[in-house]
Design a protein with these regions (language model features):
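A bilobed periplasmic-binding-protein/Venus flytrap-type ligand-binding module shared by bacterial periplasmic
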Residues: 116-131, 226, 246-260
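Sec/Tat signal peptide C-region and signal peptidase I cleavage site
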Residues: 16-22
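Bacterial N-terminal signal peptides that target proteins for export
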Residues: 1-9
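An extracytoplasmic/periplasmic, membrane-proximal ligand-sensing/linker region
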Residues: 172, 176, 182-183, 193-206, ...
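Bilobed "Venus flytrap"/periplasmic-binding protein-like clamshell domains
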Residues: 25-51, 56, 115-183, 287, ...
Length: 317
């Protein structure tokens, strides 16, 4: 082999890892299949792939909910993105509530990337039960799901509104809510997906449901933000339904490099309008929500927000 042949072979060998490394893979931990947040994860993965010409590939992982997502952030490698209400991250970092015996210094390395549609509490009852308020849920079989923030929030509301030990809690996965409702295994279920939630659409179309509204007094008692699900959002829903909502953020950790965090954040915002054209829940996500993020933002995402002049919260840096 001549000198030039050897040089050409060496050059090709050097190029191979470069082309292979051009594709960055990111794990995106969302929620249970069939939920709003799982569908959002699918949309984000497609948007990031399209917006980066395939240079960043998001692999979507199903999850039992936000508590599991936060726990896994302490043990997963750098390119790991997960969704959670920021309140849960604060609890993890403080070693409180469900994280009391699971404190981990890695929780302090969690950083925000961008907001996604807010949690929307849905208390869904089979229409033929005749239940139209929380008092009517007494003696009924209700599915809360397992391990998710929505399940914990739902249980808190039931206790708060006088239903502690007065409803039967079904031991069924939330992903099976539609089937369980249809076959009479449960009378209702609680889900925290953004509206229009796919599992509520399925239940409303297949069985007929009533979404239980919260009064202004009940909403004030929860200390959450009031949100109104407009009439006509679901089949058979003839009136607006008042409920509560809670912000949700896509997080990563300091193990993700700045360039990847920058590219993810930039592409998310550039693709958001297209996503909103496909799914209405993205229309409510705006740059103004970034200022409400209570914790630190990843330096790569910060770079993008500073370039665009987006207002930031006091703790962002």
């Amino acid at each position: 082999m001549t000198f030039w042949s050897k040089l050409a072979v060496a050059g090709l060998a050097a190029l191979i890892p470069l082309s292979a490394s051009a594709e960055t893979r990111v794990t995106y931990k969302s929620a249970s299949a069939g939920s709003s947040y799982y569908q959002m994860g699918v949309q984000v993965a497609e948007a990031i792939k399209a917006g980066t010409d395939g240079n960043i590939i998001l692999t979507l992982e199903e999850s039992q909910g936000s508590v599991q997502n936060v726990m896994e952030s302490a043990v997963r490698p750098g390119n790991f993105v997960f969704t959670s209400p920021p309140a849960l991250v604060s609890l993890a970092q403080g070693g409180k509530a469900m994280f009391k015996d699971k404190a981990n210094p890695k929780f302090d390395e969690i950083r925000a990337l961008f907001p996604i549609p807010s949690l929307t509490m849905h208390f869904v009852m089979r229409a033929d039960t005749g239940v139209t308020d929380f008092a009517g849920m007494e003696g009924k079989t209700i599915l809360l799901g397992k391990g998710s923030f929505g399940a914990r929030e739902g249980e808190k509301y039931l206790d708060m509104f006088g239903l502690k030990d007065k409803v039967d809690l079904a031991n069924v996965e939330l992903s099976n809510a539609g089937a369980a409702l249809k076959n009479g295994q449960i009378d209702g279920f609680v889900t925290a997906g953004s509206y229009p939630a796919p599992n509520v659409i399925e239940a409303a179309a297949g069985t007929g449901v009533t979404i239980i509204p919260l009064s202004d007094e009940q909403i004030a008692e929860t200390k959450r933000t009031k949100l109104v699900i407009p009439a006509g959002t679901y089949p058979g829903q003839d009136a607006d339904v008042a409920t509560t909502s809670l912000d949700v953020i896509a997080f990563t950790t300091t193990a993700m490099d700045d360039d990847t965090a920058y590219a993810l954040t930039k592409t998310f915002w550039e693709e958001k309008a297209r996503m909103a054209g496909d799914a209405p829940w993205w229309k409510g996500v705006s740059p103004e929500m970034v200022a409400a993020i209570p914790g630190k933002i990843h330096p790569g995402a910060l770079r993008y927000y500073e370039e665009k002049g987006v207002a930031l919260g006091e703790a962002a840096k």
